[in-house]
Amino acid sequence: MRTAFKLMLGVTAITIMMAGCKSMNKTQKGAAIGTAGGAAAGAVIGKAAGNTALGAIIGATVGGVTGAVIGRKMDKQAEEIKNEVPGVKVERVEEGIVVEFSSEILFGFDRSDLTADAKAKLSDLSKVLTKYPDTNIEIQGHTDNTGTDAYNMQLSERRANSVAAHLRTLNVASSRISIKGFGESAPEYTNETDEGRAQNRRVEFLITANEKMKEEARKEAGETGN
């Protein structure tokens, strides 16, 4: 009961903070969100917002001055991804980065093997990922609502696995990579139109600080031992 109450308070506090901080940049928001977030709170917020990437990144948030240091590092990395990988959506979210690839770029219809264009773009992305090795990378597969729930879940997992496997061939360490398939369960766009369904067929990369980056950021922020 006490844990649930603390989680509720954490979720409420973060939700209020996010609603009132629209004028803040991503680095400032990273500093404002405290460790009250946590993985559980992040998952709740992500589900409520219909945004699995948001929830996962909030779950990895450190907050405070350390969070601001991490945010600056992520600002730099996000800009490099935008420059190196044109045509994909790159968004700074709190202390992380979300890179969104349309499935039309990566795969043929109803397939999970990568296209030649996909391999070229993933090669470009890997150059930035290997330059900044102190991050974790969660690869999320998503589909539209065409087909059965079970089939879409399997397809999203196969696609996420294909992307992860190719990144490993490009010298992105396996220890940094995790994958999740969401099937049709987490649409970011409407499934009522062809355009919306096409946008929901996507693969997202969630880039967050690993423990080494967090520890270095704590030292830089003078918060070692906190």
Can you say where each PLM-predicted feature lies in the sequence?
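Periplasmic peptidoglycan-binding/anchoring modules of Gram-negative envelope and division proteins
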Residues: 83-84, 107-141, 168, 205, ...
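Bacterial N-terminal signal peptides that target proteins for export
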Residues: 1-9
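Amphipathic, membrane-active segments
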Residues: 74-101
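Extracytoplasmic/secreted proteins, especially bacterial periplasmic and envelope-associated proteins
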Residues: 31-32, 39-43, 76, 80, ...
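C-terminal motif of bacterial Sec signal peptides marking the signal peptidase cleavage site
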Residues: 16-20
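Short, low-complexity, glycine-enriched hydrophobic/amphipathic alpha-helices that associate
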Residues: 22-79
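Periplasmic OmpA-like peptidoglycan-binding domain that tethers envelope proteins to the cell wall
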Residues: 142-216
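Structured segments of extracytoplasmic/periplasmic soluble domains
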Residues: 47, 68, 72, 84-88, ...
